[in-house]
Amino acid sequence: MAVPPRPLQLLGILFIISLNSVRLIQAGAYYGIKPLPPQIPPQIPPQIPQYQPLGQQVPHMPLGKDGLSMGKEMPHMQYGKEYPHLPQYMKEIPPVPRMGKEVVPKKGKGEVPLASLRGEQGPRGEPGPRGPPGPPGLPGHGMPGIKGKPGPQGYPGIGKPGMPGMPGKPGAMGMPGAKGEIGPKGEIGPMGIPGPQGPPGPHGLPGIGKPGGPGLPGQPGAKGERGPKGPPGPPGLQGPKGEKGFGMPGLPGLKGPPGMHGPPGPVGLPGVGKPGVTGFPGPQGPLGKPGPPGEPGPQGLIGVPGVQGPPGMPGVGKPGQDGIPGQPGFPGGKGEQGLPGLPGPPGLPGVGKPGFPGPKGDRGIGGVPGVLGPRGEKGPIGAPGMGGPPGEPGLPGIPGPMGPPGAIGFPGPKGEGGVVGPQGPPGPKGEPGLQGFPGKPGFLGEVGPPGMRGLPGPIGPKGEGGHKGLPGLPGVPGLLGPKGEPGIPGDQGLQGPPGIPGIVGPSGPIGPPGIPGPKGEPGLPGPPGFPGVGKPGVAGLHGPPGKPGALGPQGQPGLPGPPGPPGPPGPPAVMPTPSPQGEYLPDMGLGIDGVKPPHAYAGKKGKHGGPAYEMPAFTAELTVPFPPVGAPVKFDKLLYNGRQNYNPQTGIFTCEVPGVYYFAYHVHCKGGNVWVALFKNNEPMMYTYDEYKKGFLDQASGSAVLLLRPGDQVFLQMPSEQAAGLYAGQYVHSSFSGYLLYPM
């Protein structure tokens, strides 16, 4: 049976149109839509709802001016070849508007051109059913909402008052107050201290008179300078030999320290005797010292809150000091719901796959295809559909982790002491039991009466020798020995070093009376009058100075001044001809025993083979700060060490040449106080103390003149750990010096 050709042509046209519509949908957008760049978020008006999670109803998104336009702004859903979830999918194909050139169907068998088949505009169709929820929209950029009103005031907290705080820092100095009114006129003050004597007045006119008598003898003049040393006198005759002297024995020395304990003697034989009767209980001992604080008890239960008392009168008081921060209180109850927070920042763009396509609808009854009319105009945009109902609330979330433990509670109150039970009756006297094991040593009891004298024990072994005792007191000086023979006058010695500056001498005698002065000052003011009544007058001129007061008592001698600048260099020394005995110092004087040694103190050999005339002198510096306490300070860097009498390894100067020596030390103080002592033979001669100030480097000095004999030792030592801040550095030198003033 043949089919009419016209229906076949219409079916071909419909098939071509459906293929074109499917191709456009599969390409990703209608009308050639291009995807947007992902980095530029579109500006969505605030009335468009925010992104909502999948599974909830999304309100219909209007198109046109109120929503996303159907142009190039539509974002591209990049999910490969998956079909977008569209309301037209698998439904009736809506009329597709053609933009630009009209679609001209291909010419083939049975095809008829449609240019002349333009029909009239059809009636407006009814709104279709609500489609499935569309893809999630882009995140909105909303404006922050208006700040909410403050919530109601919370209830006042309940807590214990804190401890009084530490005293605050002193406040800043206040502004000067207003100037006060002028006070009443004061009384006339007492007489002031007489002022210093004024300068002598000008010379008066020469008087006319007779020459006076001879004046009183003047005061003796000042002591003249010492004259030059005269030539040595001729040697005197040898005197008779004196009688033999005798010396008194010295006092016994101090008792030495006790010797070491000897080893314990052998154990004695066990005693034989019956155990004594149990003694009466001793008196009750004194109350023991309180024991150490016990461990904190377990946390007590929370007490019942007390009844709130009536409100007291408003107190008036000064603010107390800041209290010590108390212990953390118990965690408070859950507060009321706070104000709604400000809207958060926009979330990240949602990522979700399009939903599953809906079920395929039933196929309708095929109608007779009508004649294809011309292209109609675009119909008006339909009204947006109503929003879907809200979804059901979700399931409750997983409970959160347990919070941190609360703070330690306050210790509970101390329990009351129990009732002391009644004292039991004394039991019967028991029989003496067997000898028990030796018990632990008991507490020291009261001293009992002295027992009977025991038998003498065996002689113990000889104990070790005790420590050497301290040197005894110096003996009584012996009688004066016989006068020695006068020695031969020696050669003139070298010029000695400059001596220590002497103490300032007393004031000189009063000078002769001066020329009569001018007219004397007015007399002393009279006694104070009665207080006057009136405003204070203008300040008067400064009165003349009063008469000088009486000469006061002589003041205490001042502290020794700082050492003066070094003097000019002296004349070149004249080296005397060395004696054949090789004496290194001229005229060494007598020895300790009154007899001049035969060869005195020989000097060391010089570069050219002759004796070197070295003086016992030294200067040493400290290189290691904070030396140990209780031992001689080791000044280990030598600047000069004549005759090698100072040992830098021990810090001790040992006298070789007897005589009068001058010692000086200069120390620095840092990090603590410093207290040093100058020792002579383990005996402190003088102390020097300096107090340390934080942030400062202080100094202290000391000097002394000592008489030394051969073998005497001199050194510096710090006697206390509490003042051991002796410091030294690369450019901060602490030094110790000494030299011979003159031999004996």
UniProtKB/Swiss-Prot annotation:
Biased segments, Gly residues type: 204-218, 329-338, 412-421
Keyword presence, Electron transport: no
Biased composition, class Pro residues, residue ranges: 129-138, 559-579
Quaternary data: Homotrimers, or heterotrimers in association with alpha 2(VIII) type collagens. Four homotrimers can form a tetrahedron stabilized by central interacting C-terminal NC1 trimers.
Record PTM text: Prolines at the third position of the tripeptide repeating unit (G-X-Y) are hydroxylated in some or all of the chains.
Top-level division of the source organism's lineage: Eukaryota
Function: Macromolecular component of the subendothelium. Major component of the Descemet's membrane (basement membrane) of corneal endothelial cells. Also a component of the endothelia of blood vessels. Necessary for migration and proliferation of vascular smooth muscle cells and thus, has a potential role in the maintenance of vessel wall integrity and structure, in particular in atherogenesis. Vastatin, the C-terminal fragment comprising the NC1 domain, inhibits aortic endothelial cell proliferation and causes cell apoptosis.
The protein's name in its UniProt record: Collagen alpha-1(VIII) chain
Compositional bias segments (type: Low complexity): 169-191, 298-307, 470-507, 548-557
Ranges where the record places region Triple-helical region (COL1): 119-572
Lineage, opening ranks: Eukaryota, Metazoa, Chordata, Craniata, Vertebrata
Native species: Mus musculus
